[in-house]
Amino acid sequence: SQVHFPEREVKNRRMVMELDKGWKTWLTEATHLKGLFAQKAIEVNIPHNWDDYYGYRQLTHGNLHGTAIYEKTFTLDDSQFLISNSSFGKRYFLRFEGVGTYATITLNGKDFGRHPVGRTTLTLDVTDALKLGENKLVVKAEHPEMIADMPWVCGGCSSEWGFSEGSQPLGIFRPVVLEAT
């Protein structure tokens, strides 16, 4: 006798696209660097942190506060992600698993607002902004001084109120994915 297993149902399966490769980023402002920051875009993969780590075994961080812009262009077609009429009723979500400290998200010109992300996950319904073909995702990552509206985590380097270096990198420091459900 033979054992038969059912075929995987593709129609209702959750689809995930990793958006970790080929980002462009640059700093628009950075404390302590006084104009010495990157003014031209560099290409990076996610996770990325603008705050460098220095010293023996790279345990001492640079305490970098500032703002960085991240841009990613990605192309979607039906064979990749089922966006057209064949996927009627599906919802599409961008999931950010860590952006330090605040993230302002724009997809194809639609502003999704500023969010206190930090070390938490942010999920946005982008169904109405996503399209077949080329899509442009822009993330403004901000890590200002004196953060007062986020949980404080001692980075081990200061007792100053609102001081969160060591706990919040400047950048997109965890995965970003697009999901269809």
Question: Predicted regions: what is each one?
Answer:
Residues K40-I42, S79:
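Generic short amphipathic/hydrophobic targeting helices enriched at N-termini
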Residues S1-F37:
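Hydrophobic alpha-helical membrane-insertion signals
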Residues F5-V10, K24-E29, T60, H65-G66, ...:
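Accessory beta-strand-rich segments of carbohydrate-active enzymes
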Residues L19, I42-V44, F112:
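Disulfide-rich extracellular domains of secreted proteins
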